[in-house]
Design a protein with these regions (language model features):
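Cyclic nucleotide-binding regulatory module and flanking cytosolic helices
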Residues: 1-28, 67-69, 74
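Phosphate-/nucleic-acid-contacting segments
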Residues: 147-222
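Short beta-strand segments in beta-sandwich/barrel cores
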Residues: 19, 28, 45-50, 68, ...
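Cyclic-nucleotide recognition modules
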Residues: 59-120, 124
Length: 222
């Protein structure tokens, strides 16, 4: 996360602000902090979860190595960042990191870029949940994962998903049964292949993007 050309004293200053977290799969990287935090996910994968009344949970976003993640302090809802696989992360107090970053344009640029990416993904997700069918939602999810963690395999793309189908369902506002049914339909249509519970091959990215309701002019290449 830090600029590669950062002077030693600058590097030490940033490192002093953060605390290292090494967490096993299922563990809490950040949980209901009293202040807003920014988390750099150095390795692994995680989910940002919001908690509402009556023990209701919502998977807000999935995150992967290299992401800078904003975890709000409890307000209308409480939040936690939970590891989907063994993960290493550095947790910063958001206000302090932002204050120090004002003196270091490269770091501030990294934070702004991360904020822009998060805003874009949030807008896309609001469209997916608000306007799209179950089939389109699942196709959108697969395309999104392909862009972020997909492994090219010729004209195909392989996904090794760290999240459960329950997590996917919660993220998309669907049931587990609907997720399984839609994956089965996409498999039957020749758009994907599945292996076990976590490996999915995307066989036709252009057709899958069309299935997701993407505009034709948008590129479906990884």
């Amino acid at each position: 996360m830090l600029p590669s050309v950062a002077a030693d004293e600058v590097l030490a200053h940033f490192e002093a602000l953060g605390r290292l977290r090494i967490v096993a799969s299922g563990g809490s990287i950040v949980a209901e902090e009293s202040e807003d935090t920014l988390v750099y996910l150095a390795s692994g994968a995680a989910k940002l979860v919001a908690f509402a009344s009556q023990d209701r949970e919502q998977v807000v976003a999935f995150h992967f190595a290299g992401d800078l993640i904003s975890v709000p302090a409890p307000r209308a809802h409480a939040y936690a960042l939970l590891a989907l696989r063994a993960s290493e992360a550095i947790v910063f107090p958001a206000d302090e990191l932002l204050s120090v970053s004002h003196e270091h344009p490269a770091m501030m640029g990294r934070i702004i870029c991360s904020a822009y990416t998060s805003l874009r993904r949030s807008r896309e997700k609001s469209i997916v949940i608000g306007r799209k069918t179950a089939r389109e939602r699942v196709a959108c999810f697969l395309i999104s994962m392909a862009e972020r963690i997909g492994l090219p395999e010729g004209n195909r793309c392989v996904l090794h998903l760290p999240m459960s189908r329950r997590d996917i369902a919660d993220s998309l506002g669907l049931t587990i049964e609907t997720i399984s049914r839609q994956l089965g339909d996409l498999r039957g249509d020749g758009l994907i292949e599945t292996s076990g519970r976590s490996t999915i091959r995307l066989l036709d990215l252009a057709a899958l993007a069309a299935c997701a309701g993407h505009l034709i002019k948008q590129s479906s290449q990884i």
